[in-house]
């Protein structure tokens, strides 16, 4: 599959062949869903916590005798039916991570790349380099490309000037090739790869 290569001035500077085994797979919504849920689960801090009956400060004395008062029997004022009492089966500090095999994770990344290519939302840039770190200059160039929500993936080594210019532009993310992931690809409308990124992704995912 061939696609055109453009520069930041929206000028066509060549063509590149995209490997079908990386950019030509059928869309698998089930695989993408599993991968996104796996990523979001790993991001959760899991610091949620409520106190059980053994953790609440207070007396352990029985509030009133068992029989003879006419009231319902109670054994502790720390029970959940009392104000300030415990919560039963409440959340505890834990990890939300779950397993997902490398084979599925690799397939999910290739599927995400293929989905963007099939939708016509995959652009290839000659290079992600900026002459100045000024955001205004880069924003104007991206406007000529029609990019309002995009993820730009470059090679292993990012251009520091480009990153500084791009980091204050809303709805724009810049990642190195090794940071490419399904969640960030899908959350932006357009995926922009540099020529270096294409070569390195194909070498890693073939």
UniProtKB/Swiss-Prot annotation:
Q: Name one GO biological process term.
A: translation
Any one GO MF term held by the record is: rRNA binding
Q: Provide an example Pfam family for this protein.
A: Ribosomal_L4
What are the GO cellular component annotations?
Answer: ribonucleoprotein complex; ribosome
Keyword Ubl conjugation annotated: no
Q: Which UniProt keywords apply?
A: Ribonucleoprotein, Ribosomal protein, RNA-binding, rRNA-binding
RNA-binding as a keyword of this entry, yes or no, is yes
Q: How does it assemble?
A: Part of the 50S ribosomal subunit.
Record family assignment: Belongs to the universal ribosomal protein uL4 family.
| Name the UniProt record assigns to this protein | Large ribosomal subunit protein uL4
Q: Which gene encodes it?
A: rplD
């Amino acid at each position: 599959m061939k696609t055109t290569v453009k520069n930041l001035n929206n000028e066509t500077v060549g063509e590149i062949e995209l490997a079908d085994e990386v950019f030509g797979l059928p869309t698998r919504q089930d695989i993408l869903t599993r991968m996104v849920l796996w990523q979001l689960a790993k991001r959760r801090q899991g610091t949620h916590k409520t106190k059980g009956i053994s953790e609440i400060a207070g007396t352990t004395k029985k509030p009133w005798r068992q029989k003879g008062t006419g009231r319902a029997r109670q054994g502790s004022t720390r029970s959940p039916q009392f104000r300030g009492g415990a919560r039963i089966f409440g959340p505890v500090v834990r990890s939300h991570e779950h397993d997902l095999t490398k084979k599925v994770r690799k397939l999910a990344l290739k599927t995400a790349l293929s989905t963007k290519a099939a939708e016509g939302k995959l652009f290839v840039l000659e290079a992600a380099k900026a002459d100045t770190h000024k955001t205004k200059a880069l924003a104007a160039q991206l406007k000529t490309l029609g990019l309002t929500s995009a993820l730009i993936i470059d090679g292993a080594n990012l251009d520091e000037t480009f990153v500084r210019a791009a980091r204050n532009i809303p709805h724009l993310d810049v990642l190195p090739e090794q940071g490419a992931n399904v969640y960030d690809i899908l959350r932006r409308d357009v995926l922009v790869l540099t020529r270096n990124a294409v070569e390195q992704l194909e070498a890693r995912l073939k």
